[in-house]
A protein has these predicted regions:
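Selected alpha-helical membrane-embedding segments in polytopic membrane proteins
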Residues: 1-93, 98
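Residue-level detector of alpha-helical segments with a strong bias toward transmembrane helices
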Residues: 43, 157-159, 171
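Juxtamembrane "helix-exit" motif on the non-cytosolic side of transmembrane helices
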Residues: 38-46, 107-115, 174-176
C-alpha cells in the first residue's frame, strides 16, 4: 500500500481501494488519537478524558468512512449492493486522509513547544496550508472513490463536508452534555 498521500494522492487512493486494509487504516487513526491524547496530557487532563479523546478521533474517522461509503452508494452511477469490500475501501481512504492529521499534530508539537515569538505564527500558517491540502486530498479521494467527474465529485465533497460537520457537532454536543450530567 502506498502512503504517499502528500504528493501523489490519486495513486495513493487508487492503491488503497485496490488493496484495502481496515487494520492499516485503524492503526493510522489509533496513532493519531494517541498523539492527540499525549498533547492533551501535557495540559494535565485526567486519564478518562485522554481515553475519550482517542475514542473521539476513532469516531471522527468512522463517521467519515460511513459517509464516504454512503455517498459512494448514492452517487455512483451503477447499481451496487452493500458489499463489505466497498466499506473497507472507504475506510482505508479515510485512514489515508488521517496521515494529514498526523502531520498536523507533528507541526503542533514542533511549533507549539518553541519559545520563540515568531514560531507560533509560522506554525499557524503551516497549519492553514496543511488544512487546505487535506481538503484538496479529500476531494481527490472522493473523485477516486466515486470514479466520477470533477463536477459530481465537487457536489459530493460539499455535501460530505456539511453532513460531516453537522454529525460531529451533534455528537460533540451529546457527548459534552453527557459529561456534564
Amino acid at each position: 500500500m502506498d502512503y504517499n498521500v502528500f504528493t501523489k494522492p490519486t495513486q495513493t487512493f487508487g492503491s488503497a481501494i485496490e488493496d484495502s486494509s481496515l487494520l492499516r487504516a485503524l492503526v493510522i487513526v489509533l496513532i493519531s488519537g494517541l498523539l492527540a491524547a499525549f498533547f492533551f496530557s501535557l495540559t494535565g487532563m485526567g486519564n478518562l478524558a485522554l481515553g475519550l479523546i482517542v475514542v473521539w478521533v476513532i469516531v471522527q474517522w468512522f463517521v467519515l468512512s460511513v459517509l464516504l461509503f454512503a455517498f459512494e452508494i448514492l452517487f455512483s452511477g451503477q447499481k451496487r449492493q452493500f458489499v463489505r469490500a466497498d466499506f473497507k475501501a472507504a475506510a482505508t481512504v479515510a485512514g489515508q486522509l488521517w496521515l494529514w492529521v498526523l502531520l498536523l499534530e507533528v507541526v503542533l508539537l514542533v511549533f507549539g513547544s518553541t519559545l520563540f515569538s515568531m514560531a507560533p505564527m509560522i506554525g499557524i500558517a503551516v497549519l492553514i496550508v496543511i488544512g487546505v491540502a487535506m481538503l484538496i486530498d479529500l476531494f481527490i479521494g472522493i473523485r477516486v472513490v466515486l470514479d466520477s467527474s470533477n463536477g459530481r465529485a465537487f457536489l459530493v465533497w460539499l455535501l460530505l463536508l456539511i453532513v460531516y460537520g453537522l454529525i460531529l457537532s451533534l455528537a460533540g454536543i451529546i457527548a459534552s452534555s453527557m459529561i456534564l450530567l
